[in-house]
Protein backbone atom coordinates (compact mmCIF):
# COMPACT_ATOMS: atom_id res chain seq x y z
CA UNK A 1 0.00 0.00 0.00
CA UNK A 2 1.23 3.49 -0.82
CA UNK A 3 3.01 4.79 2.31
CA UNK A 4 2.06 8.32 1.30
CA UNK A 5 -1.68 7.66 1.56
CA UNK A 6 -3.17 10.28 3.82
CA UNK A 7 -4.99 9.18 6.94
CA UNK A 8 -7.65 11.47 8.34
CA UNK A 9 -5.91 12.97 11.37
CA UNK A 10 -8.94 13.58 13.53
CA UNK A 11 -8.75 11.24 16.53
CA UNK A 12 -12.46 10.45 16.41
CA UNK A 13 -12.27 9.53 12.69
CA UNK A 14 -10.33 6.36 13.51
CA UNK A 15 -11.86 3.35 15.24
CA UNK A 16 -9.85 0.76 17.13
CA UNK A 17 -11.11 -2.58 15.85
CA UNK A 18 -10.16 -5.46 18.16
CA UNK A 19 -10.65 -8.80 16.43
CA UNK A 20 -11.64 -11.97 18.32
CA UNK A 21 -9.59 -11.64 21.51
CA UNK A 22 -11.46 -14.61 22.97
CA UNK A 23 -10.53 -17.52 25.21
CA UNK A 24 -10.82 -20.13 22.46
CA UNK A 25 -8.00 -18.42 20.57
CA UNK A 26 -5.84 -17.31 23.50
CA UNK A 27 -5.74 -19.75 26.40
CA UNK A 28 -3.01 -22.41 26.56
CA UNK A 29 -5.52 -25.20 25.85
CA UNK A 30 -7.45 -23.23 23.22
CA UNK A 31 -8.90 -25.31 20.36
CA UNK A 32 -7.62 -22.73 17.84
CA UNK A 33 -4.43 -21.43 19.46
CA UNK A 34 -2.45 -18.37 18.45
CA UNK A 35 1.27 -17.78 18.76
CA UNK A 36 1.61 -15.02 21.34
CA UNK A 37 -2.03 -14.04 21.42
CA UNK A 38 -2.42 -14.10 25.20
CA UNK A 39 0.54 -11.74 25.59
CA UNK A 40 -1.40 -9.15 23.60
CA UNK A 41 -4.07 -8.72 26.28
CA UNK A 42 -2.32 -6.00 28.35
CA UNK A 43 -0.97 -4.37 25.20
CA UNK A 44 -4.41 -4.04 23.62
CA UNK A 45 -5.98 -3.02 26.94
CA UNK A 46 -3.52 -0.11 27.13
CA UNK A 47 -4.14 0.75 23.48
CA UNK A 48 -7.90 0.75 24.05
CA UNK A 49 -7.49 3.22 26.94
CA UNK A 50 -5.39 5.41 24.66
CA UNK A 51 -8.07 5.34 21.96
CA UNK A 52 -10.86 6.17 24.42
CA UNK A 53 -8.90 9.13 25.80
CA UNK A 54 -8.58 10.43 22.24
CA UNK A 55 -12.34 10.18 21.75
CA UNK A 56 -12.10 7.28 19.31
CA UNK A 57 -14.59 4.42 19.28
CA UNK A 58 -13.34 1.04 20.45
CA UNK A 59 -15.03 -1.91 18.74
CA UNK A 60 -14.62 -5.56 19.68
CA UNK A 61 -15.64 -8.45 17.47
CA UNK A 62 -16.74 -11.72 19.01
CA UNK A 63 -16.87 -14.90 16.95
CA UNK A 64 -19.85 -17.03 17.95
CA UNK A 65 -21.32 -20.34 16.83
CA UNK A 66 -24.54 -22.13 17.72
CA UNK A 67 -24.18 -25.28 19.83
CA UNK A 68 -25.63 -27.42 17.04
CA UNK A 69 -22.85 -26.27 14.68
CA UNK A 70 -25.38 -25.56 11.92
CA UNK A 71 -23.74 -22.20 11.27
CA UNK A 72 -20.18 -23.53 10.99
CA UNK A 73 -20.47 -24.08 7.24
CA UNK A 74 -17.46 -25.75 5.67
CA UNK A 75 -15.36 -24.80 8.70
CA UNK A 76 -16.76 -27.90 10.40
CA UNK A 77 -14.69 -30.09 8.09
CA UNK A 78 -11.28 -28.68 9.04
CA UNK A 79 -11.54 -26.73 12.30
CA UNK A 80 -12.24 -27.91 15.85
CA UNK A 81 -15.37 -26.71 17.61
CA UNK A 82 -14.74 -23.25 19.05
CA UNK A 83 -16.50 -20.11 20.28
CA UNK A 84 -19.77 -21.88 21.05
CA UNK A 85 -22.55 -19.72 22.44
CA UNK A 86 -23.07 -20.34 26.15
CA UNK A 87 -19.53 -21.58 26.75
CA UNK A 88 -16.53 -19.86 28.30
CA UNK A 89 -14.49 -20.09 25.10
CA UNK A 90 -16.58 -17.38 23.48
CA UNK A 91 -15.75 -14.85 26.19
CA UNK A 92 -13.39 -11.95 25.61
CA UNK A 93 -10.17 -12.51 27.54
CA UNK A 94 -9.84 -11.49 31.17
CA UNK A 95 -8.19 -8.11 31.38
CA UNK A 96 -9.75 -6.91 28.14
CA UNK A 97 -13.42 -6.60 29.02
CA UNK A 98 -15.17 -3.94 26.92
CA UNK A 99 -16.11 -0.71 28.68
CA UNK A 100 -19.76 0.45 28.64
CA UNK A 101 -18.84 2.99 25.96
CA UNK A 102 -17.33 0.34 23.68
CA UNK A 103 -19.17 -1.47 20.91
CA UNK A 104 -19.23 -5.25 20.56
CA UNK A 105 -20.02 -6.94 17.25
CA UNK A 106 -21.55 -10.19 18.45
CA UNK A 107 -22.48 -13.31 16.51
CA UNK A 108 -19.65 -13.00 14.02
CA UNK A 109 -20.15 -16.29 12.18
CA UNK A 110 -17.36 -16.06 9.63
CA UNK A 111 -13.73 -14.96 9.41
CA UNK A 112 -14.74 -11.61 7.89
CA UNK A 113 -16.18 -9.35 10.61
CA UNK A 114 -18.25 -7.43 8.05
CA UNK A 115 -20.06 -10.47 6.68
CA UNK A 116 -23.56 -10.74 8.13
CA UNK A 117 -22.93 -8.17 10.89
CA UNK A 118 -23.72 -4.51 11.51
CA UNK A 119 -20.04 -3.49 11.53
CA UNK A 120 -20.15 -1.32 8.41
CA UNK A 121 -23.34 0.39 9.58
CA UNK A 122 -21.79 1.14 12.98
CA UNK A 123 -18.65 2.58 11.39
CA UNK A 124 -20.64 4.80 9.02
CA UNK A 125 -22.88 6.05 11.83
CA UNK A 126 -19.73 7.10 13.69
CA UNK A 127 -18.29 8.70 10.52
CA UNK A 128 -15.21 6.51 10.69
CA UNK A 129 -12.60 6.92 7.95
CA UNK A 130 -9.69 4.88 9.34
CA UNK A 131 -9.43 1.54 11.12
CA UNK A 132 -6.60 0.64 13.48
CA UNK A 133 -6.79 -3.15 13.66
CA UNK A 134 -5.57 -5.34 16.52
CA UNK A 135 -6.25 -8.90 17.63
CA UNK A 136 -6.16 -12.42 16.21
CA UNK A 137 -5.59 -14.26 14.00
CA UNK A 138 -3.57 -12.14 11.59
CA UNK A 139 -3.61 -14.82 8.89
CA UNK A 140 -7.33 -15.58 9.19
CA UNK A 141 -9.92 -13.20 10.65
CA UNK A 142 -7.74 -10.10 10.75
CA UNK A 143 -6.74 -10.57 7.13
CA UNK A 144 -10.28 -11.34 5.92
CA UNK A 145 -11.69 -8.32 7.74
CA UNK A 146 -9.02 -5.88 6.57
CA UNK A 147 -9.41 -6.92 2.95
CA UNK A 148 -13.17 -6.34 3.13
CA UNK A 149 -12.65 -3.01 4.89
CA UNK A 150 -10.33 -1.82 2.16
CA UNK A 151 -12.89 -2.76 -0.48
CA UNK A 152 -15.38 -0.61 1.43
CA UNK A 153 -12.91 2.31 1.22
CA UNK A 154 -11.74 2.37 4.83
CA UNK A 155 -8.09 3.26 5.33
CA UNK A 156 -6.57 0.47 7.39
CA UNK A 157 -3.67 0.32 9.79
CA UNK A 158 -2.73 -3.17 10.98
CA UNK A 159 -0.83 -2.93 14.23
CA UNK A 160 2.32 -5.01 14.08
CA UNK A 161 2.73 -5.20 17.85
CA UNK A 162 -0.96 -5.76 18.65
CA UNK A 163 -1.73 -8.72 16.36
CA UNK A 164 -0.82 -12.40 16.37
CA UNK A 165 -1.33 -15.32 14.00
CA UNK A 166 -1.77 -19.06 14.14
CA UNK A 167 2.03 -19.18 13.93
CA UNK A 168 4.78 -16.58 13.80
CA UNK A 169 5.53 -17.48 10.17
CA UNK A 170 1.88 -17.13 9.12
CA UNK A 171 1.55 -13.87 11.01
CA UNK A 172 4.54 -12.43 9.16
CA UNK A 173 3.34 -13.77 5.81
CA UNK A 174 -0.11 -12.25 6.33
CA UNK A 175 1.38 -8.85 7.11
CA UNK A 176 3.46 -9.01 3.93
CA UNK A 177 0.36 -9.78 1.88
CA UNK A 178 -1.79 -7.11 3.51
CA UNK A 179 0.71 -4.31 3.00
CA UNK A 180 0.73 -4.84 -0.77
CA UNK A 181 -2.67 -3.22 -1.25
CA UNK A 182 -4.88 -3.44 1.82
CA UNK A 183 -3.23 -1.78 4.82
CA UNK A 184 -0.35 0.13 6.28
CA UNK A 185 1.58 -2.04 8.72
CA UNK A 186 2.56 0.11 11.68
CA UNK A 187 3.56 -0.15 15.31
CA UNK A 188 1.10 1.11 17.89
CA UNK A 189 3.10 4.29 18.47
CA UNK A 190 3.54 5.13 14.79
CA UNK A 191 -0.14 4.45 14.07
CA UNK A 192 -1.24 6.67 16.94
CA UNK A 193 0.88 9.51 15.58
CA UNK A 194 -0.65 9.04 12.13
CA UNK A 195 -4.22 9.36 13.36
CA UNK A 196 -3.67 11.87 16.16
CA UNK A 197 -4.24 9.70 19.21
CA UNK A 198 -1.50 11.40 21.18
CA UNK A 199 1.25 10.11 23.44
CA UNK A 200 1.34 6.69 25.09
Residue ranges and their predicted role:
Residues 1-103, 194-200:
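Active-site acidic carboxylates
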Residues 132-135, 153-168:
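A short glycine-rich beta-strand->turn/loop micro-motif centered on a GG-aromatic cluster
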Residues 165-180:
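Active-site-proximal loop->helix
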Residues 53-56, 127, 153:
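Glycine-centered short loops/turns at secondary-structure junctions
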Residues 75-79, 150-151, 173-177:
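Short, hinge-like loop/turn segments at secondary-structure boundaries
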Residues 142-152:
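Short Gly/Thr/Asp-enriched flexible loops that form oxyanion-binding sites at enzyme active sites
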Residues 93-136:
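Internal catalytic-core helix/loop-beta-alpha segment
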Residues 182-200:
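A charged, well-structured terminal subsegment
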